[in-house]
Amino acid sequence: MGKTIRFGVSLDSDLLEKFDKLCDEKSYQTRSEAIRDLIRNMLVEKEWDEADGQMAGTLSLVYDHHQSGLSQRLTELQHDSHDLIMSTLHVHLDHDNCLEVMVLKGDGKQIKELAHRLISTKGVKHGKLGLTTTGEELV
């Protein structure tokens, strides 16, 4: 194990308040412990994501459709990868927020790249890729 290094994190005050409540619910002694676990979870997911070949899955995005240009940018990214997107469901969660769920099928690496591009688009509040098998290799 390497040496401990301190670094700063800037967060919206509302997000920090929710994070602190979550830390209390999960019995974390410090924010640092919770952040370490979050980082570890992301690293484990990265290991899982390195599998290649044909995959299927879902990608869920939550975003504020009022944010300037965001809906158009997300649509452009989806059209650029139309061959991977089998279906899209768009739900109005409330006056401001939308949930978009995409069913994906194709090369695992391409699916992951698309998901990363969409999730990292400025203005996306939350995104989650769930991968599964196409079933072709299952008996």
Swiss-Prot record:
CDD domains: RHH_NikR_HicB-like. The keyword Transcription regulation applies. GO terms for biological process: response to nickel cation. Its cofactor is Ni(2+). Ni(2+) binds at residues 79, 90, 92, 98. Keywords: DNA-binding, Metal-binding, Nickel, Transcription, Transcription regulation. InterPro entries: Acetolactate_synth/TF_NikR_C, ACT-like_dom_sf, Arc_rbn_hlx_hlx, CopG, CopG/NikR_regulator, Ni_resp_reg_NikR, Ribbon_hlx_hlx, TF_NikR_Ni-bd_C. Transmembrane segments: none annotated. This is Putative nickel-responsive regulator. The lineage of its organism: Bacteria, Pseudomonadati, Thermodesulfobacteriota, Desulfovibrionia, Desulfovibrionales.
